[in-house]
Design a protein with these regions (language model features):
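Glycine-rich Rossmann-fold phosphate-binding loop(s) that bind the pyrophosphate
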Residues: 14-17, 38-39
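Residues forming the Rossmann-fold NAD(P)(H) cofactor-binding site
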Residues: 20
Length: 156
């Protein structure tokens, strides 16, 4: 069963960097906005790419500095990296950023909808959620679904 249509000035498919930035800006311009994400808002950069990678890179830089601390006149002994603690550090950074982003989206009045979206026609988006299907009527639609790598089956 499809619920009644909800009308929006802008519906955005994909809650990664481009999608959430567009949603926040459109909301600031007084548009009624729905942002649809099938996973967690923030996309690859926040959850699996840029942010967690940089957090772990920071751990490596600190480890390197501790190992070379004698050159700074600091006496210490490097005993290795506790990977469980490093992963916990990384997860904490990702979680704080995700919560901050979610709060900002909510504060700007964007309707964040968790589900799988499909274009029904030029002004209608159907969203499959855990609660059922929604139909959203949109004056404008942005496709910000990102990309996924695909192997081409050639050995290199």
């Amino acid at each position: 069963m499809v619920e009644s249509k909800n009308s929006y000035d802008l519906v955005i498919l994909g809650g990664g960097t481009a999608g959430y930035a567009a949603a926040i800006r459109a909301s600031q311009l007084d548009m009624k906005v729905a942002l649809i994400e099938r996973d967690k808002v923030g996309g690859t950069c926040l959850h699996r790419g840029c942010i967690p990678t940089k957090a772990l890179l920071h751990v490596a830089e600190v480890a390197h500095s501790v190992r070379d601390s004698k050159s700074f006149g600091i006496l210490s002994e490097f005993q290795g990296v506790d990977m469980e603690a490093a992963i916990k550090f990384k997860d904490g950074i990702v979680d704080r950023n995700h919560k901050g982003l979610s709060g900002m989206i909510k504060a700007d009045g964007v309707d964040l909808i968790s589900g799988e979206a499909k274009l029904k026609d030029q002004s209608t988006v159907t969203v499959s959620t855990d609660e059922g299907e929604l139909e959203l009527d949109a004056k404008n639609i942005i496709l910000a679904t990102g990309s996924e790598p695909k192997t081409i089956g050639i050995e290199i």
